[in-house]
Amino acid sequence: TSCDPDAESYTPGELEDGNQGICFVGNYTQTVEVEPGITSFDLTLTRSLTDAAGTVDVTVINNEENIFVCPSTVSFAAGEKTAKLTVETPSAAEGITYNLQLALSGNDVSNYSSGYHEISVNFAILKWESIGTGYYLDGTVANFFGVDPSVPMAVEIEKTTTATSTRFRFDSPFAKVATAQDEVGGFNGYPFNEEADVVPGEYTFVIDVTKEGASLKPVQYGMDWGYGMFSGGSVYGNLSTNINSYPLGVYNEKAGSITFPANSLYVSMADYQDGGAYPF
């Protein structure tokens, strides 16, 4: 039988004399999801004794469709607490989940270590699909500066499915100067911007929808009105754990809309009030 380091009642035993207690960081089952174009990922190993250098053997127990290329050993320099195990995935396809199971062995692996010496990793490259043009209406910058919050900005939306959510993304409409409107009135940028307000770069809004609700990941807007870069995101999960005071957004699949209620999002400017975040 083996012990479960995640169990509440689990207390590690004493390591054998001189054993460094090398193990994986994290749970037995781990999920790794990466964006297209990324062909590797890192797993982290840790150890209890760090005075001397150490090496551990890595055995592949399961390599689904032979997607994974793994090193046979991982080494720690003297004094190092953690080390990286880099897994290459050169032939993985988008939108498919592959399983990798690894085991550690050697004189510095112990059944009494603080974590697992075997893990199972479910790996996937996210597959994005275009779902067409949508319209973003902003109530953060608008309320902060008193400009019209009902102005629609046309954005090209992509969608993917992760292990825990449905995810949407689109380029920041604030990182552009509006030069035209489409047939329904959507601007192709932020109509209150001038050229000098735009900060060159790539800025992407990412919204995760789960059973709890919709959450906007922290994002830089790509816009500066003289007080530093604008940024924003969901208050809950980033600035607060009080979901009653700072609710998540509401996803209406039938209507094809996501609505963020009052106090669900924050806005910040890097050089204003030390970059303080203000809920709206």
Regions found by a protein language model. Give the residues of each.
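Ser/Thr/Gly/Pro-rich, low-complexity flexible regions
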Residues: 126-280
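Acidic/polar, low-complexity intrinsically disordered N-terminal segments immediately downstream
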Residues: 4-142
